[in-house]
Swiss-Prot record:
Annotated source species: Aliivibrio fischeri (strain MJ11)
A single GO cellular-component term on record: cytosol
Residues involved in Mg(2+) 2 binding: D115, D118, E280
Entry note: cofactor: Binds 2 magnesium ions per subunit.
Name of this protein: Fructose-1,6-bisphosphatase class 1
Localization of this protein: Cytoplasm
Listed EC numbers: 3.1.3.11
GO BP term (any one): fructose metabolic process
């Protein structure tokens, strides 16, 4: 039997990657791990208790909040505030960033941005959902409340990013800039165990993930790329396979393991794209680049975009390097 390495043990062993770290980042990820266990427990019994469905409230984007969105947001926020490594949190579910006011929190080095429950509308049909998180070092002075500028940093400033996928098994996948590592939750032991070390996305793939129901509203370059994907060319492994779950974490996770591309382009309804730069695109972009892939908005690298507002949206193309490059070629050829 091979040695079991838990998430906590792995993080401690990797602390030498941060010569100036004193354990705060490791403890911060421990807070995320704790909240993930709590949310996972609630998701697993969602069909048995009155926690699925709409809460009756809307978030800043005008989207109907699900009850579990609110629950997950509260649990992650509470777990992060309870320890002294985080001075503030920005969430897709909150209009503004939240600065933690306790003195210990104001002395913290980090801020966290999160989508507490991505794909939550799928819960009542038992489809995988997830949590996405992003960690930055604050730029405001230590000992003062966090400011909005702490959160409006380009993605290449992230010190860590990751996601938790709640599915047939629950996994936590994260990077601190030294590889992408996945941990599977063992409910009998109550721990996340290392199951996927140094994850790498294949340079090529044959899976494309896009909501083809929006086809008539896509830019011409995307329409032409989809035709390319569907053409029969056995010599270069086409036609490709269409796989779209409607949960970013689930689609991303599959493509990371098998090779593929996830596309959410601009549409007539969402000319700037629909996905949030800070809560979804930046953390996934850091992960995919660490795994050897690419992430762009169709024109530039996602991690180079300087955000102008907390809930900024962008088009998003992420996955295997050669597939992202091919999308760019079509967008360039058919650009207005």
């Amino acid at each position: 039997m091979s040695e079991i390495r838990t998430l906590g043990e792995f993080i401690v062993a990797k602390q030498h990657d941060f010569p100036h770290a004193s354990g705060e980042l490791s403890s911060l990820i421990g807070s995320i791990k704790l909240a993930a266990k709590i949310v996972n427990r609630e998701i697993n019994k969602a069909g048995l208790v009155d926690i699925t469905g709409a809460s009756g409230e809307e978030n800043i984007q005008g989207e109907q909040q699900q009850k579990l969105d609110v629950y997950a947001n509260d649990k992650f926020k509470a777990a992060l505030e309870a320890r002294d490594q985080v001075c503030g949190v920005a969430s897709e579910e909150e209009d503004e960033a939240v600065a933690f006011n306790k003195e210990l929190n104001q002395n913290a080095k980090y801020v966290v941005l999160m989508d507490p429950l991505d794909g939550s509308s799928n819960i009542d049909v038992n489809v995988s959902v997830g949590t996405i998180f992003s960690i930055y070092r604050r730029i405001s002075p230590i000992g003062t409340p966090a400011t909005e500028e702490d959160f409006l940093q380009p993605g290449h400033k992230q010190v860590a990013a990751g996601y938790i996928i709640y599915g047939s098994s629950t996994m936590l996948v994260y990077t601190t800039g030294n590889g992408v590592h996945g941990f599977t939750y063992d409910p009998s032991l109550g721990v996340f165990c290392l199951s996927h070390e140094n994850m790498q996305v294949p340079k090529d793939g044959n899976i494309y993930s896009i909501n083809e129901g929006n086809y008539i509203r896509f830019p011409e370059g995307i329409k032409q790329y989809l035709k390319f994907c569907q053409e029969s060319k056995p010599e270069d492994n086409r036609p490709y396979t269409s796989r779209y779950i409607g949960s970013l974490v689930a689609d991303f996770h599959r493509n990371l393991l098998k090779g593929g591309i996830y596309l959410y382009p601009s549409t007539q309804a969402y000319p700037n794209g629909k996905l949030r730069l800070l809560y979804e695109c930046n953390p996934m972009a850091m992960l995919i680049e660490e795994a050897g892939g690419k992430a762009t908005d169709g024109e530039q690298r996602i991690l180079d975009i300087k955000p102008s507002e907390l809930h900024q949206r962008v088009p998003f193309f992420v996955g295997s390097t050669n597939m992202v490059d091919k999308v760019h070629a079509f967008l360039d050829e058919w650009r207005d």
